[in-house]
Amino acid sequence: MKDLLKFLKAQSKTEEFDGIKIGLASPDMIRSWSFGEVKKPETINYRTFKPERDGLFCARIFGPVKDYECLCGKYKRLKHRGVICEKCGVEVTQTKVRRERMGHIELASPVAHIWFLKSLPSRIGLLLDMTLRDIERVLYFESFVVVDAGMTSLERSQMLTEEQYLDALEEYGDEFDAKMGAEAILALLRAQDLEHEIATMREELSQTNSETKRKKTTKRLKLMESFLQSGNKPEWMIMTVLPVLPPDLRPLVPLDGGRFATSDLNDLYRRVINRNNRLKRLLDLAAPDIIVRNEKRMLQEAVDALLDNGRRGRAITGSNKRPLKSLADMIKGKQGRFRQNLLGKRVDYSGRSVITVGPTLRLHQCGLPKKMALELFKPFIYGKLETRGLATTIKAAKKMVEREEAVVWDILDEVIREHPVMLNRAPTLHRLGIQAFEPILIEGKAIQLHPLVCSAFNADFDGDQMAVHLPLTLEAQLEARALMMSTNNILSPASGEPIIVPSQDVVLGLYYMTRSCVGAKGEGMVLSGAKEAEKIYRAGLASLHARVKCRITEYVKNEAGELVPKIELKNTTVGRAILSLILPKGMEYALIDPPLPMTEAGKAELAEHPERWIKYVSNQAMGKKQISKVLNTCYRKQGLKDTVIFADQLMYTGFHYAALSGSSVGIDDMVIPDAKKDIIAAAEAEVAEIQEQFQSGLVTAGERYNKVIDIWASANERVSKAMMENLSKETRQNSLGEDEVQASFNSVFMMADSGARGSAAQIRQLAGMRGLMAKPDGSIIETPIVANFREGLNVLQYFISTHGARKGLADTALKTANSGYLTRRLVDVAQDVVITELDCGTSEGLWMTPLIEGGDVVEPLRERVLGRVVAEDVLKPGTEDVLVARNTLLDEQWCNTLERNSVDRVKVRSAIACESDFGICAHCYGRDLARGHLVNNGEATGVIAAQSIGEPGTQLTMRTFHIGGAASRAAAESSASVKNTGVIKLQNAKSVENSAGKLVITSRSSELTIMDELGRTKESHKLPYGSVLEVKDGQAVKAGEIVANWDPHTHPIITEVAGRIQFENMIEGITITRQTDELTGLSSIVVLDVNERTTTGKELRPTVKLVDANGKDVLIPGTDVAAQYFLPGQAIVQLEDGAQVNVGDAVARIPQASSGTKDITGGLPRVADLFEARQPKEPAILAEISGTISFGKETKGKRRLVITPTDGGDAHEEMIPKWRNLNVFEGEKVQQGEVLADGPESAHDILRLRGISPVANYIVNEVQDVYRLQGVKINDKHIEVIVRQMLRKCEIVNPGDSDLLEGEQADVVRVKIANRKLVAEGKQPATFRRVLMGITKASLNTESFISAASFQETTRVLTEAAVSGKVDDLRGLKENVIVGRLIPAGTGFAYHHGRLEKRRQAAKAVVPVTQQATADEAEQNLADLLNAADNLNA
């Protein structure tokens, strides 16, 4: 028996493999797979349910229906294993062979494989250089094709209609050979000499100049080369033998009532066999040509339907009018093999139930219903029962468990001890959607969840359900405990901030207990310590909010690093003192009670009246943000364990005091301000006035509408301001008898103020006014809802507000689907980015500066570089001293150092610049955000990045924003004023000084920045061309000063030299007209548009030249170019010919069409556009090269822009539509990549003209803008990881000595590796330029065809892979999941490394492989063993 077991173990050993190759199957290969030919369309006998012989379920071909039993029943039982029954021909073996044995059908006529025919581009068409239409006409018997022209004037693969064929037959007889149907295509493919074709095509490529021809030839060449290299033969794309799927994979199940449920494939196979057999008969009978042709065409259609139903013509439908599911449908789509069964499986040892709240649990625990636990832990219980000797067999143990005997519960308790379970809440949007907990057995049927982990799961208790999974093996339990335990996941992997943060009740409780109240019971007491504070509160001698003096003990680290107590008398409140009891040792008291900064006046008052200290107690209560900050500080200072305990204590305390506070909301809590009536009345009066003006024709309809909306918007603001002031403050008398203003104890206000629930905007709707509402099309209705919810809405108001509510619901549904799809694309593109090495050694990276918009620092440098590795030494500003050495990980301490030394730009390592071949290195990635140290090898950073970007997707909006009304008017600014005091610094600004001694800006992208005394950038303002500066570079300014002015409505042309004006080609009535202003009486010259001019004026170009007193041209300083300014159409000149001008004067002005309401694409669609690298509609036009601008000959709708390079290379020309507003003038110098015409910039242009860093910065900043608007924090590095994946392809510019083709797209890594090899051999490496690819395209273009096929467009990916005989090396995560291996990341990283090492060792020492026994030998051995065993028994 032992031998037998050993033998069975050896049988089930799987082959080790390192890769999977896909290719075309030759007819011989198909026959070698097959166990026999299927000749009949019959399936099973309806009476006996036995499979018919030679049919689709034949037992002789596919194996026995019952284990170890032949069909006729002559041989039964294991001992006859391997015998072939002489009566029914069935081999006696296991029935599972019916899942793996294939059959085949010998086709009477060859048939084209529809994938290689119809999947675009058609592979057969490309190879034969025929159009798909022509090939289809041949295949479906509509025309002939010449296969062999012989000595005739016909050409090979020439199409002939029926008549032409007959004519040719008459003319040439059997000199030539023409056929129709798949035979013809087969003959053509066989006749192709690939090597010869490739040689001629390479010849052609080197000679041709036509772009289209080159593209087409390159495509054909690549296809032929891939055929040649892969060993596939082109004629295998035409099938002569059809494989038949094993029957158990296309089951036929009898239902009750004599009907059968069957897989659609059986119907499809039946049609093929029927038609094939009929065709064979017809051919034997030598039937007329037309009949045979029709039958062949039907066979072709039947095989098409079997392989991919509906790909050509109408889909074949079953009895119930729905299309049959073909082989291709089996594997593609959400319900296909890949996504349904390989990537997402259902799991054993799992259960699900509703969740309820478990406020008494510890952070690492969850409550598990006893019933569930008993079911999940069954095998463990059976095992324990047996080892204890309480049950003799498994069966007995099973009985005991079913009876639920008392001892079973005791054993369950033991089994469950320290055995973590995993809880999962769908949708699992990020890795915190599955966490491990220790189960606590509870009565009832609901799982209890710890309140603090709800935000990670995004769970609430309104009926949410969660699934429980049980890690079985020791390794699984270890991973669950060490990596997935809720206590090990305190920080969010997206931003590195705590995700275990109290919310709602807990926040309210903590806020309530840390509030101070004027004149509360016990005010002014002096207490001996926090314990006493708790005593007097419990005894009812003092209120929780009473302001008292209390001795607080803090623990501070001394020189030796030990904690020593430090006792201090502090002005605080009773509640804060009590809260300090749960603070971990080593945390400062100031975190929960920040001391008030003392002013001089305050100190003087206290010296005079010491009893007034009660007025100097901080009135800052702890809100949600503050609590989060405390937890974060605790984690960084005290470590994980203390933080977890502290978080739990905070929660218990919060719940306790929230209950004691008795906070509740009544209708009287929503106090409506008295000023509301007056504000609304005033607004209505203003609206009436505007209406009158409109009726008397003073304002246009559009202006009136905008005005009205403005009026109501500001009225709404005023009402809500009045309401908040009214609600948030109250006056009370303190113990000294003085009145003090304090924050109100109104419940609604407290909830919003603490961050527990609600916001000012919601309170505004409850107690202010609801305000303006939008119509379904997005436009704003001009009559607002003046009522609020407390007053109640009337019918009209209610109806108006339903629009928004309904749109919100529809949006949410759309948003969820869109967001999920974005996450899926992101995961797919980044799935194989894993940390593979410690340091790739690059010194490249990104420059990080604080993000500043106008006067506000949006994101300080500290937040941008925290957790990054420095790429170049950071020098102390103004010196050469190294402050931070290269390759240092910037943690909180280093960031403090940077801030102290006021560094404002740092070059950090980035995933985009990482030089690792596969994956990225730890230094380029930096800190693992969820753990707070340098990232470990094998961390799946790509998936984490994708989850971090995709998870908040549902919070983003779906809509396009319209800026209208107030916002659009605010946009037309005419000056810049500073918010901070500091020193002016101009960035890339060219300027001239005008006669008044002020600087006039003459460059496009100038910025004015304000530096503080330490040299840090505080704010920055963009200065348009022609702005007049009120200050000089380096001048000190005070906050609120105006630093620059400009005219927002016109675009000036500034002269850079002084001189006299001379007009050229300015002819009145032909190129210009004069206009006189009615109000001022001043006349000005207006240049006519080209299309307004007469024919004589079309060619003329109105110009203003500057000449000196002698009439000579004045040159632009520093060049030998004459100062002349060409005037575009509509330009206004207010000077006369011969007038004198100074430097910095405007010679002309171009009126700017007021940029109307621009639509800003926001939210999810914007993020998707960025990651898909879509071209914007009208992108900004960038300068292709650096040089001088001039304008060439104009065409009807476009003007010709010419850039002449300064170094004398070839000029670059470009046609630009007339209506585009150009930012440049003739003769201006531009740098490559500068904006010539405004518009949304295209990421592709930025990459091409400015390089990789700018495009990375652009995408990162644009994506961050969208998320920042919603208040979502995501670390930049996640977006960088995705951008790295978008940049992984390149276009070959010059192939050098490599075997790449010019213009071909290839993986950057592959090219780099090939180049290294070429350089080592002393050959010419290939040159390339990087290409930006959208995430969908990048996913489909991965190295791994398994990963691409399981993403989208399965058919196309597999067709392409098969033709080129691709090998999948199983490098990424998806491929390994699909073949059922550990993924090469996380704990599987070491396993894969070990396998690699083993392979390397094996390659070094090649040993003769011991031949494995063939199946037949193995069966023979087993039969011998069994017989021996039987003999022994006998």
Swiss-Prot record:
Catalytic activity: RNA(n) + a ribonucleoside 5'-triphosphate = RNA(n+1) + diphosphate
Binding positions (Zn(2+) 2): 840, 914, 921, 924
Keywords tagged on the record: DNA-directed RNA polymerase, Magnesium, Metal-binding, Nucleotidyltransferase, Transcription, Transferase, Zinc
Required co-factors: Mg(2+); Zn(2+)
Cofactor binding comment, as recorded: Binds 1 Mg(2+) ion per subunit. Binds 2 Zn(2+) ions per subunit.
First-level EC class: transferase
Residues that hold Mg(2+) according to the record: 460, 462, 464
SUPFAM superfamilies attached to this UniProt entry: beta and beta-prime subunits of DNA dependent RNA-polymerase
GO CC annotation: DNA-directed RNA polymerase complex
GO biological process terms held by the UniProt record: DNA-templated transcription
Chain residues that bind Zn(2+) 1: 70, 72, 85, 88
One Pfam family hit: RNA_pol_Rpb1_2
Gene Ontology molecular-function annotations: DNA binding; DNA-directed RNA polymerase activity; magnesium ion binding; zinc ion binding
Enzyme Commission number(s) from the entry: 2.7.7.6
Family note: Belongs to the RNA polymerase beta' chain family.
Record text on subunit structure and interactions: The RNAP catalytic core consists of 2 alpha, 1 beta, 1 beta' and 1 omega subunit. When a sigma factor is associated with the core the holoenzyme is formed, which can initiate transcription.
Record function comment: DNA-dependent RNA polymerase catalyzes the transcription of DNA into RNA using the four ribonucleoside triphosphates as substrates.
NCBIfam families registered for this protein in UniProt: rpoC_TIGR
Protein name: DNA-directed RNA polymerase subunit beta'
Species of the source: Tolumonas auensis (strain DSM 9187 / NBRC 110442 / TA 4)
